[in-house]
Amino acid sequence: SREWTDILANELQFEESDVHIGILDSGVNNAHPLIAQALPDSRMSTAINVQDNLDHIDHGTGMAGLVLMGDLTKLAYDRGNLPVVQHNLASVKIVDANYSTAPSFYGAVIEDAISQSQDMGADIDCMAVTDSISDDGKPTSSSAALDESIYHSGECDRLVLVSAGNIYQDEDRK
């Protein structure tokens, strides 16, 4: 709720840090009071052909909050005892509800997003978007792009956290 957001925003403390975590997702609404201090406009970008780098599907913003602060439910009950946030964010939009990337170009988008995120100072990237298309474990342009971006010409200096998919409780949604 807005009330909890205001309470947490007033109590959260941010420590200056060189650690940046890139959010490769649907963009981030960096004006959100819990995120604004950790994500300036200068560290927001897009790897797809859309007009802006903001989140219009409320996924990337939630991921940014989770990466920045962890479980907000726990924080809400730890008032007066909140941890100091010791990292910052970068955001590269790779999906949008009104834009469709051809599957054959997923790899190019991922490579571009990781590169942009690193250029904005990210040490670690988080890509928590999934695709319903399965190739039964065979390599795809996406997996090849991840491998190549992480290998980074032999430097192996990048850490990318990738979701393995969603778990559905409803048998009809498998």
Regions found by a protein language model. Give the residues of each.
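A broad detector of the eukaryotic-type serine/threonine protein kinase catalytic domain
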Residues: 48-49, 130
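Subtilisin-like serine protease catalytic core
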Residues: 10-43, 50-105, 123, 136-138, ...
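Substrate-binding/access-modulating region of protease and related hydrolase catalytic domains
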Residues: 94-174
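Autoinhibitory propeptides
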Residues: 1-13
